[in-house]
Amino acid sequence: MGDKTKVQVSKLKPGRYIIIDGEPCRIVNITVSSPGKHGSAKARIEAVGIFDGKVRSIVKPTSAEVDVPIIDKRVGQVIAITPDTVQIMDMETYELYDVPIETGVEDEVKDQLKEGITVEYWETLGRIQIKKVRGE
């Protein structure tokens, strides 16, 4: 996977996604400082990691380009649950994925997981995270 694209900093908005330190993150806040007499405007971007929940921030000129992850939102079925992984099968391609429970499953979804249910998962930068339960 590893799909990403470039976007100009001035086009970013809260709620969108960005790659900071190689980690896909959701933008929480953007503050733009006005340019000085000979400088360019700078943007401070605060974001939370999708997989680890860590808060990260960067400062870039508004004219700079940054990497933005391409997030593939898909539907799968839980095939098996082990103490440390969940095995899901994609409903379109029938591929099997082993997702680690610690980093690959949202906290509010962990107690709802059982074999045979349908889940929505996100795939980005070669990593998978189960986001929500769709139903039986």
UniProtKB/Swiss-Prot annotation:
Coiled coil start-end: none
Among InterPro entries, the record links this protein to: IF5A-like, IF5A-like_N, NA-bd_OB-fold, Rib_uL2_dom2, Trans_elong_IF5A_hypusine_site, Transl_elong_IF5A_arc, Transl_elong_IF5A_C, Translation_prot_SH3-like_sf
Gene3D superfamilies of this UniProt entry? 2.30.30.30, Nucleic acid-binding proteins
Q: Which PANTHER family match?
A: TRANSLATION INITIATION FACTOR 5A FAMILY MEMBER
Q: Which PROSITE patterns match?
A: IF5A_HYPUSINE (PS00302)
Please give the CDD domains that the UniProt record associates with this protein: S1_aIF5A (cd04467)
Keywords of this entry: Cytoplasm, Hypusine, Initiation factor, Protein biosynthesis
- Write down the SMART domains for this protein, in alphabetical order: eIF-5a
Principal location = cytoplasm
Q: Which organism is it from?
A: Thermococcus gammatolerans (strain DSM 15229 / JCM 11827 / EJ3)
* Entry's localization field: Cytoplasm
NAD found in the keyword field: no
Summarizing the function annotation, the protein's role is: Functions by promoting the formation of the first peptide bond.
Q: Which gene encodes it?
A: eIF5A
Q: What is this protein called?
A: Translation initiation factor 5A
Source lineage: Archaea, Methanobacteriati, Methanobacteriota, Thermococci, Thermococcales
